């Protein structure tokens, strides 16, 4: 049997806006987009990591910062203008679907609540799914 570095769970989500957040997508997820191979995906990650090369630090330069829109970001990663225009249709600059976990305790009774929410705007955050453990 063939071995794969990732599974479907690492690449797809059943609840989303239908676009990939270019600022948080993994190397493997980026490669699902037309014209983005492993080298270009690695370049996208390098670009968004900022000067220190570490993601999640103060010097990160995500798409959308300092006037760098998705098209310009993709062009900086080595895509032609035509390739960038096609690939850009699959990307967004922010995440819109989140999992929220809350642990509650009332009179020594504990329960964990989990919700999937969609962030349409700061004031429009519908609950898409809700359950408890």
Where on the chain are the PLM-derived regions?
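Compositionally biased linear targeting/interaction segments
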Residues: 1-133
């Amino acid at each position: 049997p063939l071995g794969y570095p990732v599974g479907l769970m690492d690449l797809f989500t059943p609840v989303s806006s239908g676009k990939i957040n270019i600022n948080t997508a993994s190397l493997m997820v980026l490669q699902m987009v037309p014209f983005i191979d492993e080298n270009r995906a690695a370049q996208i990650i390098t670009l968004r990591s900022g000067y220190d090369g570490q993601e999640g630090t103060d010097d990160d330069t995500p798409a959308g910062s300092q006037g760098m829109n998705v098209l310009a970001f993709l062009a900086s990663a080595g895509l032609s203008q035509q390739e960038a225009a096609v690939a850009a249709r699959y990307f967004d600059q922010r995440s819109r679907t989140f999992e929220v976990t809350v642990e509650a305790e009332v009179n020594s009774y504990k329960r964990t609540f989990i919700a999937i929410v969609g962030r349409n705007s700061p004031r429009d955050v519908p609950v898409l799914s809700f359950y408890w453990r």
